[in-house]
Each structure stands twice: as structure tokens, then as C-alpha cells.
Amino acid sequence: MSKIRIALLQLLSAGYDQLANQAKGMQYCRMAKQLGADIALFPEMWNIGYKLPDSALPDQVEYWQEHAIDRDSDFVNAFRKLAWDLDLAIGLTYLERWEAGPRDTLSLIDRHGEIRLTYAKVHTCDFDREINLTPGEYFYVSELDTAAGPLKVGAMICFDREFPESARILMLKGAELILTPNACELEANRIGQFRARAFENMLVVAMANYAIPQENGRSAAFDGIAFKETGSRDTCLVQADGHEGIYLAEFDLDLLRAYRLSEGWGNAYRKPERYGLLTSRSVEPPFVRRDARR
């Protein structure tokens, strides 16, 4: 069997109560495994429920910083043990302690309890409270051992998906699946944009958001296989409503790989020598923003 199931954990958090979030997260991972999942994905910054401070309030910033955790924390290690116990890969998200200031992080734990990659959000929302975060520097892809065989997995987080370069780089690094934790309103335009990331790179994208009322749910996954022999097809694997729950996305890895071998997107017909301007640091009106970090 080459089928892989991803459990999108569309949850409500307990805010800064990390022990409660840990217990609930572990409960839902167990439920996901019972549903046959190979991978469970949390929404963004699960350990504190995507809480962010007001930069103008130092006490609030300090309190928030105190809730950042290390990769070797009890919180992360509890999920590493759980992954091994359940034979389940887990995309775990948390506010990561970092020397320059906390980062918005995902660690992909394999079904043997080992961390395969740790990624920090590159495109922080500098126009809002995410200005308090330290942006990540790189995009990573790692080979994940699954029951269906090895799978190349990358990650991007929320605002990252609104930049085509994020998914493009991950595709160029070999990603077949991109895990995308989220914490914002998902409306038609953002979901359409996310669908396009799968289509243009011929890969699977899977996104987990918070449920109503913390966000509006609508977690989604798309497999990027836009055509079959008889014509166009819908790439949507799952589209959640707003309610809390586990939403399963299943895709056929062999079918995806066969499609990628024959179709014209991804890296098949690109002309990188024509794209030099994409790496320019220059910003001209109307896109100048005083709060933007480069």
C-alpha cells in the first residue's frame, strides 16, 4: 500500500496552560492513530495556543518569553515518546526559546520518536505582534520513514504559504509533502492560494488551523494532481468546517510520484537564469513598509 494518511488536528487551545495543551494534544494524537493516521499535524504554536504579546507592554513581552521552550524540553520529549509508543509521526509546534528572541517553530518527529527536522517560520507577520518573533533563516526537507516507505517532507508556517517562494524552495529540495501549521482566518482567497501551491509544485500540502472561535477552522489538504487521463480533477483531499476535530487527508504516494514524472510543472520547465530579480533586496513603492524586516 502506498496510501498515506495525515490527521489535521483542528483544535482549541488552553492558551498559556502548556500542561493542558500537552495533555489534549496527546489525547488527539492517540485518536488520530486509532483513525489510521501516519502523520498528525498541530496548528501553529500549539504549546501556548498562538499567544503573542503587545510590543508596547514590556511585562507582557517578558511573560510571553518565559513560555518559550527548548527542543529538548519536557513538552517536546513527551511527544517524542508518544510518537514512538504510537508508531505515529507528529508535526509538533511550539514557541521555541532562542537567543535573539523566541521563534515560531515546528519539529517533525518520526514514528520512532526522532526529530527529523526543526523549522522556524521565515515570513513573520512584522506588521503585527509577530514582530516579537525571531524569523527563521532556512527551509528544510527531510526523509520521513512511513509504513508506505520513505517520504520527503518539508514545512512552512502560516504566512509562509502566502509567498510562492516558500513552497518552491521546498519543491526544489525534493519535498513531496509540505506540512503547514496555521493560526489565522482561512477564507476563499487564502485557501485558493494554498491550493495553487500544490498545483504549481506537484506535491501535497496539508494545513491545520485552530477551530472556531479561536480561528475559523477550515483546515485543508490538496494533492497537486490536477489532471488524470480523462481530464481535470479536484485536488482537494479534505476541507474542514469550523468545528474542533480531526480531519483526515489521504493520498496515494505512488500516484503522486507517477504524476510528477510526466507533467510540466514543478522544476520541469523552469528558467532560473531569468529569475535573478527575485533575490534582489530592493523594495520600491507601493511595497515599501517601514516595519518590514529583510
Question: Which role fits each region the language model picked out?
Answer:
Residues Q18, A23-H112, C184-N201:
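Cys-nucleophile CN-hydrolase/nitrilase-fold catalytic domain and related Cys-dependent amidase chemistry
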Residues A68-I90, R161-L248, L256:
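CN hydrolase (nitrilase-like) catalytic-core segments centered on the catalytic cysteine
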